[in-house]
Amino acid sequence: MQSERSLIPTPMPVRRHARSGNRGLALTALCLAVLLVVMDNTIVNVAIPTMSDALNASSTDLQWVVDAYTLSFAALLLPAGKLSDRWGRRRMLLVGLAGFAVVSAATAFSWALWQLVTLRVVLGVCAALIYPATLSSIIVIFEGSRYRSLAVGLWAATSGVGIALGPIIGGVLLEHYAWNSIFWVCSVIGAVALACIAVAVPEVRAYRSERFDFPGTVLSVAGVGLLVWAIIERPTYGWLSWQVIGGICAALII
């Protein structure tokens, strides 16, 4: 009997911070964080022609301002989710949003293409820290609540709204202000979401967690990164080019 019990896996409990927070404010803050992450990926598209004139760069080169964010975000999404389970989702959200607000403000001061692309890569890293922690936090905050499905539905709907809202807000801003105004707006939204999460979102993490698989994480980042890069470069080289085929094959092998 003793040996049989030892074979039964014990569930991994969740450790919560003493602060319970307000569910409504917490949901609003988490949805605002998701809105920021998704919107920042689409708000830049409408600013590319204006950036081209201001930075004296071609539209093709400036496309990497959009793609750099997508690439770093997609490559680090899975490792960031695993890290939030170990380190704490609230802590991950605070670090990600603080970084997002600061880097977005720094991006507004860019005067060269390489600066803009580099900072967009960093913004993608911050977005990867934020996005998975929002959903997992909502699931825990609304655990046992009849509104849990509604909260998750609002989270998903916010992602869709962010995709559509980005070009609209970007167009309005560019109608009256310079191209860097889109980054100032994102910085302000990030700061507001940061303050709300600091007040309303409790800390949650697992008591026990599996050992962090560093080699597997590196391979995951490399594989997803290569796959996303191949898809991004498909319009430039074509599906049958050796660059795209090689990138996809390397991603599948990894």
Spans of model-derived segments:
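Hydrophobic transmembrane-helix bundles of small-molecule transporters
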Residues: 153, 175-254
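Transmembrane-helix bundle of Major Facilitator Superfamily
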Residues: 2-199
